[in-house]
């Protein structure tokens, strides 16, 4: 066989590799869909809002049991609602948007890597992203972050293709359009615009290397039009929302508008009231674990990046500069969550790919990665074994969470330990992909079924049904989470999600006082202590989310509640299709 034939044969391998890589991605991302319900903290909230959209026809103003939810714009909830209307199952609908957006993100990384380098680098970049711990975690969660990561990646894709591949303004405008879509999904969708900063630096320092400059007229108008396109995308939701609020003359809608435009954007960033972390939180506590395996490779990758930047390689400078700016942007804000920096991960995989072939051949890196897998595997195995032999700490955990997952940990740990044995000779780095595939395969099937009862209040409502039957009854929720709305087979009322607990208790007492038929209060046992209710008349209905829940009937009312009477608004919800 001559050299030309060998080259053709080698080239033809890549389409097969690409196909099987995306098959693997689809399996890892979609496995487990339909096997579990929405789990706290955020999933039940978004699922309930989406379900309510379909049931009520109110799509512009997200609500949870009639109370408006101003924390996030509605795009992500629209996507869940669309699939719920299509399939009629919240179990299927709630995970599909994140899964599909994650697949699109993988494709975008593959395509731009291929255009900037070659198919080989594209395969490596896509594999690195797919096998990054945080990426898969969010791909399999119904949180907004996988979707906003997708829109931000489209923005970065459009700008990189515009700056470095082909001079067509449509890519520039596409980037800004999806920045706008990102903003009405979650406020930080504008982040790709930060890539203009390293681009301008590159243009100033290496003007002879600037492809865009050679093909661009000096007019600033086309550049400014990008911002106009972004505003047009934002206005798709923003303008109708403002018009509807103005015409409604509803104070609660005006409060919704002000909250989502100001408190949940500027105030939340500059003066956050929760998730307070130090400036170095992402560098010390998030990146080392959640960006595995790339995080381990950073000591070897940084010299490669430095060398590329010295040569003026915009393929590295632009994404890397953008990643640094994104990390700085989120680090400056006092409120931090690990998931906030997810949008930087696709670009990190992109700039790691050209050099990862060299990195995996480093013995120290390969052994380090294998060592991480070994420690995690032994930890899983040891944890499972401790439960089997009834170690005291394991029994305490079992009692606390009401769960006996010991065989799951034992089997999963055994399989991943087998992975370390198989990869202890030869290419040690292969331990990571085998480990991650095994872990997610086990967790998304067996693990989901184990956690289902613990992560939902189904058992509580099952016990309520045993106590009061299926007759017409309305349950008032006090100091609750959204999953109690989502899983309730009964009509429910509540007194405002953020209303102080004592006000909720007073309002619940007044509500119950009005009639002695068909009304019940579901409340944490610790709140039955203020003289409004008789503790001995409270009926235990079980534990959920580490809380002991009790059911109060009219007979549990005391003669007089010492709490101050309140005019708190009462919200109600009648489930059309209860989640089962």
Give short role names for the model-derived ranges.
Residues 27-32, 45-68, 75, 82:
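Extracytosolic helix-loop segments that constitute the early lumenal/periplasmic catalytic or substrate-binding loops
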Residues 96-116, 154:
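Transmembrane-helix motifs of polytopic, lipid-linked glycan transferases
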Residues 108, 148-165, 348-351:
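Specific aromatic-rich, kink-prone transmembrane helix
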Residues 46-49, 178-181, 190-337, 347, ...:
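Transmembrane-lumen/periplasm boundary regions of multi-pass, lipid-linked membrane glycan transferases
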Residues 115-116, 155-172, 182, 356-360:
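Membrane-interface transmembrane helices that cradle and orient dolichyl/undecaprenyl
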Residues 2-6, 10, 16, 173, ...:
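Membrane-embedded architecture of ER/inner-membrane glycosylation machinery
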């Amino acid at each position: 066989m001559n050299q030309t034939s060998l080259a053709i044969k080698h080239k033809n391998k890549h389409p097969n590799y690409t196909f099987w890589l995306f098959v693997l991605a689809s399996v890892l991302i979609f496995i487990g869909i339909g096997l579990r319900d929405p789990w706290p903290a955020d999933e039940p909230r978004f699922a309930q809002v989406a379900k309510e959209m379909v049931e009520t026809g109110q799509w512009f103003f997200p609500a949870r049991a009639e109370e408006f939810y101003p924390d996030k714009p509605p795009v992500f909830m629209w996507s869940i609602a669309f699939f719920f209307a299509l399939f009629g199952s919240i179990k299927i609908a709630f995970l599909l948007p994140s899964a599909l957006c994650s697949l699109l993100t993988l494709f975008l990384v593959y395509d731009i890597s291929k255009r900037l380098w070659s198919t080989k680098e594209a395969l490596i970049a896509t594999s690195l992203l797919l096998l990054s711990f945080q990426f898969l975690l969010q791909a399999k969660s119904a949180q907004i972050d996988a979707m906003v990561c997708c829109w931000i990646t489209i923005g970065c894709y459009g700008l990189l293709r515009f700056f470095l591949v082909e001079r067509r303004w449509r890519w520039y405008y596409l980037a800004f359009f999806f920045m706008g879509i990102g903003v009405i999904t979650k406020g930080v969708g504008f982040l790709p615009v930060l890539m203009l900063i390293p681009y301008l630096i590159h243009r100033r320092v290496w003007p002879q290397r600037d492809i865009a400059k050679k093909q661009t007229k000096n007019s600033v108008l086309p550049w400014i039009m990008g911002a106009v396109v972004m505003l047009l995308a934002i206005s798709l939701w923003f303008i109708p929302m403002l018009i509807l609020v103005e015409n409604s003359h509803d104070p609660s809608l005006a409060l919704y508008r002000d909250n989502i435009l100001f408190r949940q954007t500027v105030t939340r960033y500059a003066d956050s009231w929760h998730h307070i972390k130090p400036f170095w939180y992402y560098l010390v506590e998030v990146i080392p674990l959640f960006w595995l395996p790339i995080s381990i490779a950073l000591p070897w990758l940084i010299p490669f990046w430095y060398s590329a930047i010295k040569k003026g390689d915009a393929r590295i400078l632009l994404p890397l500069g953008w990643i640094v700016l994104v990390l700085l942007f989120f680090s400056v804000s006092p409120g931090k969550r690990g998931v906030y920096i997810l949008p930087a991960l696709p670009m990190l995989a992109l700039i790691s790919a050209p050099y990862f072939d060299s990195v995996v051949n480093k013995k120290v890196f390969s052994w380090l990665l294998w060592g991480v897998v070994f420690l995690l595997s032994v930890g899983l195995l040891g944890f499972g074994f401790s439960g089997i032999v009834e170690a005291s700490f394991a029994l305490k955990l079992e009692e606390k969470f009401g769960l006996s997952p010991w065989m799951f940990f034992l089997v999963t740990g055994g399989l991943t330990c087998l992975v370390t044995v198989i990869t202890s000779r030869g290419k040690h780095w292969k331990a990571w992909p085998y480990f991650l595939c095994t872990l997610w395969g086990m967790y998304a099937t067996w693990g989901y079924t184990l956690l289902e009862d613990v992560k939902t209040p189904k058992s509580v409502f099952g016990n309520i049904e045993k106590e009061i039957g299926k007759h017409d009854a309305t349950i008032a929720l006090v100091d609750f989470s959204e999953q109690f709305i989502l899983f309730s087979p009964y009509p429910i009322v509540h007194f405002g999600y953020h209303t102080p607990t004592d006000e909720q208790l007073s309002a619940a007492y007044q509500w119950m006082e009005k009639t002695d038929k068909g009304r019940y209060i579901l409340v944490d046992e610790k709140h039955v202590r203020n003289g409004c209710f008789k503790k001995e008349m409270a009926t235990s209905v079980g534990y959920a989310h580490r809380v002991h829940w009790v059911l109060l009937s009219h007979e549990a009312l005391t003669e007089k509640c010492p709490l101050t009477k309140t005019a708190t608004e009462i919200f109600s919800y009648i489930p059309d299709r209860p989640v089962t």
